[in-house]
Amino acid sequence: MAEGFAANRQWIGPEEAEELLDFDKATQMNEEGPLNPGVNPFRVPAVTEADKQEYCKILQPRLQEIRNEIQEVKLEEGNAGKMKKKRQRRRRKKKAFKKMMTDLEDRFRKLFGSPSKDEYTEIEIEEDPPKKEKRVDWDEYWDPEEIERMLMD
């Protein structure tokens, strides 16, 4: 049986088996509590090398399951960092867009919001001076989700 695993590079030896069972025991204690965590047969004081090899043969299916669980967790952790980078990039783009929009708003206010002195005098004669303009709320003109989609592309 060991020859078949060795040919496929899937055979788990005593050292790795000991670590995998320690991981399984720690996971079990974390999820179910420390009442009955079980015993790692590789850590029994009087175990011989032949006994360890025998345990490896017997426990191969369970050891393979534990190894696959660990690999899945590593894959999920790798993706977590990727999502964090995406969130940071999205925040930077939103911040840059917000700054750009406030700059544009200030420019428009300077261009169209405050009349020149000559026009102001004429307007003052005809009507009351214009009231202070409210700051433009761009959410009314732009859909924030649409802007976010444009920025993320």
From Swiss-Prot:
Keyword RNA-binding included in the entry's annotation: yes
Keyword set, alphabetical order: Host cytoplasm, Host nucleus, mRNA transport, RNA-binding, Transport
GO biological process: mRNA transport
Chain intervals for the UniProt region annotation (Disordered): 24-43, 78-97
Coiled-coil regions listed: none
GO CC entries: host cell cytoplasm; host cell nucleolus
Keyword RNA-binding set for record: yes
Composition-biased stretches (Basic residues): 82-97
A Pfam family per the record: Env-gp36
Any GO molecular function: RNA binding
Motif (Nuclear localization signal and RNA-binding (RRE)): 84-95
Protein localization: Host nucleus, Host nucleolus; Host cytoplasm
Function: Escorts unspliced or incompletely spliced viral pre-mRNAs (late transcripts) out of the nucleus of infected cells. These pre-mRNAs carry a recognition sequence called Rev responsive element (RRE) located in the env gene, that is not present in fully spliced viral mRNAs (early transcripts). This function is essential since most viral proteins are translated from unspliced or partially spliced pre-mRNAs which cannot exit the nucleus by the pathway used by fully processed cellular mRNAs.
Quaternary data: Homomultimer; when bound to the RRE. Multimeric assembly is essential for activity.
Domains (record comment): The RNA-binding motif binds to the RRE, a stem-and-loop structure present in incompletely spliced viral pre-mRNAs. This region also contains the NLS which mediates nuclear localization. These overlapping functions prevent Rev bound to RRE from undesirable return to the nucleus. When Rev binds the RRE, the NLS becomes masked while the NES remains accessible.
Name under which the protein is recorded: Probable protein Rev
The species this protein was found in: Feline immunodeficiency virus (strain San Diego) (FIV)
